[in-house]
Regions:
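Long, hydrophobic, amphipathic alpha-helical segments used as structural scaffolds
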Residues: 1-7, 11, 37, 41-44, ...
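Glycine-rich cofactor/substrate-binding loops
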Residues: 124-125, 138-248
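Charge-rich, acidic-biased intrinsically disordered regions
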Residues: 3-25, 49-64, 126-141, 178-184, ...
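Internal glycine-rich alpha/beta core junctions
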Residues: 18-169
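Long, non-coiled-coil amphipathic alpha-helical linker/lever segments
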Residues: 1-17, 79-95, 175-179
Length: 248
C-alpha cells in the first residue's frame, strides 16, 4: 500500500509504454488470482453409488421396491459430494479434470507474476533485501539473485506438467473401467506439494522486495515520448487529421 500510487513506466514488447502504477500492476494479479480461485472453489467433487457397471444391477436384484437412484443421491449428498447420475464402474472424474484445468490456469497466472517480478528486479525497479547470513550469489558478492521467484516458476511448471498428465488420463477409461488412471492419481499429492513449495517461495521473495523509487521516477522523467498516446488522442478529439503520423 505504501507504494501503490508510485507512477512508473509500463513496458509493451519490452519497450517503454504509457505509464502505470506499481499498485495497479499488483492489483492485476490480485484480480486474476481471485478469478481463478473463485472458479476452483465453485467446483464440487462428485460421487456415485450405482454398482459395478453403473446400472444398479445388484441393487435391484436385492430389492426391487427401493428407488435406488433417489436413495443413492441422498447417500452421496450426505458425504458432501455432488451426485453423478451417470457413470460406469467409476465416477467419471470430469469435475476433477475441470478443477485441475482451473488449477493449471491459476498456476499460469502465478508464473506470469513470478516472471514479471523477475523482470522488474532485472531492471533494478525492485530491490531485494537480504537477511543476515543470506548469500545473494555463490561467486559474485555484488549480486542478489531472484532465486525465490525462479524456484516458484520452476516448481509451478512441474506442477503444470503433472496436471496435464493427470487431466488427460483421468477422463479416459476403457469401456466400463481400466486401471491405467490409478497409478497416475497417486501423483496428485506431489502435484499439490510442488504448488505449496512455489507459494512459499513467492511469499518469501515478496517479503524481500521494495521499489527503487529514485530510478523508477528518473526513468519516467526521461521518457517524455510516452505522452504521445495522450497527445494524439487530444488531437483526434479536436479534428486534427493524420495526428498519429504527425506525433510520430
Amino acid at each position: 500500500k505504501k507504494y501503490s500510487k508510485l507512477s512508473m513506466l509500463a513496458f509493451t514488447h519490452g519497450q517503454p509504454a504509457s505509464p502505470t502504477t506499481l499498485g495497479k500492476e499488483f492489483s492485476n494479479f490480485s484480480y486474476r488470482i481471485k478469478f481463478h480461485l473463485d472458479h476452483i472453489k465453485s467446483i464440487k467433487q462428485k460421487g456415485k453409488f450405482n454398482g459395478a457397471s453403473g446400472n444398479y444391477n445388484a441393487h435391484l436384484f436385492a430389492e426391487k421396491k427401493v428407488n435406488w437412484e433417489t436413495l443413492s443421491k441422498k447417500f452421496v449428498n450426505s458425504l458432501g459430494l455432488d451426485f453423478s447420475s451417470h457413470s460406469t464402474q467409476i465416477e467419471l472424474k470430469d469435475a476433477m479434470a475441470f478443477q485441475l484445468a482451473n488449477t493449471h490456469n491459476l498456476n499460469n497466472v502465478l508464473i506470469d507474476f513470478a516472471q514479471d517480478i523477475w523482470l522488474l528486479i532485472s531492471k533494478n525497479y525492485l530491490k531485494q533485501n537480504l537477511k543476515a547470513g543470506e548469500v545473494g550469489s555463490s561467486t559474485m558478492p555484488h549480486k542478489v539473485n531472484p532465486i525465490d521467484f525462479e524456484n516458484a516458476e520452476g516448481n509451478l511448471s512441474i506442477a503444470n506438467g503433472l496436471i496435464i498428465a493427470l487431466k488427460n488420463k483421468i477422463q479416459i477409461s476403457r469401456l466400463q473401467r481400466d486401471l491405467s488412471d490409478s497409478t497416475v492419481l497417486r501423483n496428485i499429492g506431489s502435484l499439490f506439494a510442488y504448488i505449496i513449495i512455489s507459494l512459499n517461495s513467492l511469499k518469501k521473495g515478496i517479503a524481500k522486495i521494495e521499489p527503487n523509487k529514485e530510478l523508477i521516477l528518473k526513468d519516467l522523467d526521461n521518457s517524455w515520448e510516452i505522452l504521445t498516446e495522450a497527445i494524439q488522442t487530444i488531437l483526434r478529439k479536436n479534428g486534427v487529421e493524420d495526428s498519429y503520423t504527425k506525433i510520430k
